[in-house]
Amino acid sequence: MTCDTNESIDPYKISISSENSLNDHVKQRFERGLSALLTDPYFLLLHVPENGAKMQIVQPAKNSYHRERMVKRINEAKGIPSFYYALSHLWKVSKDDPHLWEEIGEYVDDLDEQPAEPVSMRPEKRDTLLGLLKDHPGSYWWIDVLCARTDTPLDIMGDIYRCCLECIAMIDCEPSVLSKLHTEPNKRKEYIDFDWFYAMDKPSPEDLLYFKQQYDKYPELLYHLAKLQQSEWWKRVWTWQEMALPFGDVRLMAETDTQRLQSNTITVDDLINSFTNAADIDFYVNKTDGVDAEDVVGFRDVRGEWILEISQARAFSKHDAEKNHAYQFVVLMLSLGDSTRRCMDHVDYVYGVLGMLNIKIPRMTDPKAVWKRFLSELDNHMDMADIKGEVISVAGCGRGKIIGIGESAYKINLQEFECMGDVYRDILDMENLS
């Protein structure tokens, strides 16, 4: 799988260096995903030249020059074995108000080396994006409005975000909000999960002391998290897996931040650390006499479901070696069942989660056909991963045996539902053993 030298008989073969610090499982995942992408004619990237020349859309599968450069970067990487950035952003456009960026052709040439056609992008985001690209000479980017076409398979998105070097998420918030969310590493837990909340029902005196220290150190943390929670970026279906899938960092920045200061950004993993510290503060306020919750700004405004959804999805993806573990699978489905995320096209309730489950479904427009195919593929996934028949215990839900897909799931009509939770809340059939 790996090579010990920089020499390669085939300049287009991905063979990550044995000097790379990542474990073999992660290397294999990148080798498979990137090999598939670089030979896929639907995979397009935006190239930002080193010399400041006009940017160009390239097709690695048919462009030997760029493909060879990409493979070289992958094979020689010491850290994340990838070479391109992926952009996540909130469209907020409509047929009546598409916000066409007519001037994009002044900055970008399409595959045919002609100026790119107008794309939809709100005006307030354009200078931020152009500045971001200018800051990364010699880089490659996957940006949906430029690189995805009407015939691009939707199930390719999983590999695109999973295998990127870094995902930059331009979100709708004030730049100053993100700078106030940095906190010191929590000493007790990396990720928040269901067990975490229930285990802290009766905290020890030592726990309460630590919670108080967090409260004294970050008295306004809950307030700033409540402001971040208001961002529409957290409320869309597609941004769920764009946030969760990348093995590398997912870096949040304000879509209007033309200064692009590093201090005004935060990674999702660092944000989750702040979630953990915020949970400590929450427990302290709840369990301590003499502390009035009404005096803690933001205490009533931060939704626990929002925190759990982000933490569970990111943990599920980062702990890829355990992805097929029954417990992780069920917890992920439970978090989907609590999600309030929405989409414009009902089939996206399926296509927006395929990457997390490693399921491939061809692009279809009929919601009933999409859901039927999804249930078939999900059932097969549970068989192949030996999930059925497993007995697990989830805090707050009890002990149960996983039977499979619930009967009610086969009666679901995607067009009748208004959010992700409505679709996935009762998808699993479990026998209660409590």
Model-derived regions, located:
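A residue-level signal for conserved active-site and pocket-lining positions in enzyme catalytic cores
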Residues: 87, 161, 240, 353
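Short helix/strand-capping turn motifs
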Residues: 281, 285-434
